[in-house]
Amino acid sequence: MKKTPSPTDEETQLFRDAIKGTRKIKQDTIRADLRPVKQKRELRESREKLGVDHYFSDEYQPHLEADGPTRYVREDVSKFELKKLKRGSYPPEIYLDLHGMNQQQAKQELAALLTLCQKENIHVASVMHGIGKHILKQRIPSWLAQHPNVQAFHQAPREWGGDSAILVLLDIEE
């Protein structure tokens, strides 16, 4: 690299004449007001809560077949897609583990997962609810059936969680 030539005496004098009359800044630290950040965070949290409450109602009970594994297919989707999901033809691209979460936390995480899948164009997700007291195992299918982007879901094959997980096929807008 080339070295920058040092300024001549004439250039130095011109610079000093140009800044004549200026004074040193005593303190240049600017203290930003944190209120806008807090307002943005509160707005984002309220939007997230709205999304959870909008899609996932606890009162809604979809018609899910009681016999056999947990499964659902939207009316406008081919039942063949459900079979492919059951066989494991669609490997999950993302996993969500809900072990140890309460219903509200699980709802928020599920909403965040579906939003992320939409943003990242992810078509198949695995939601691991665990065995436990069967609370999440019963709630998650009813929540998923309410979401407009969920085409189908089926109890996961053994290699992806078996009884303690659900594979979800999503309808992602390109």
From Swiss-Prot:
Q: Which SMART domains match?
A: SMR
SUPFAM superfamilies per UniProt: SMR domain-like
The Smr domain is annotated at 96-171
Q: What is its EC number?
A: 3.1.-.-
* UniProt KW keywords: Endonuclease, Hydrolase, Nuclease, RNA-binding, rRNA-binding
Q: What does this protein do?
A: Acts as a ribosome collision sensor. Detects stalled/collided disomes (pairs of ribosomes where the leading ribosome is stalled and a second ribosome has collided with it) and endonucleolytically cleaves mRNA at the 5' boundary of the stalled ribosome. Stalled/collided disomes form a new interface (primarily via the 30S subunits) that binds SmrB. Cleaved mRNA becomes available for tmRNA ligation, leading to ribosomal subunit dissociation and rescue of stalled ribosomes.
The protein's name is: Ribosome rescue factor SmrB
The gene that this protein is the product of is smrB
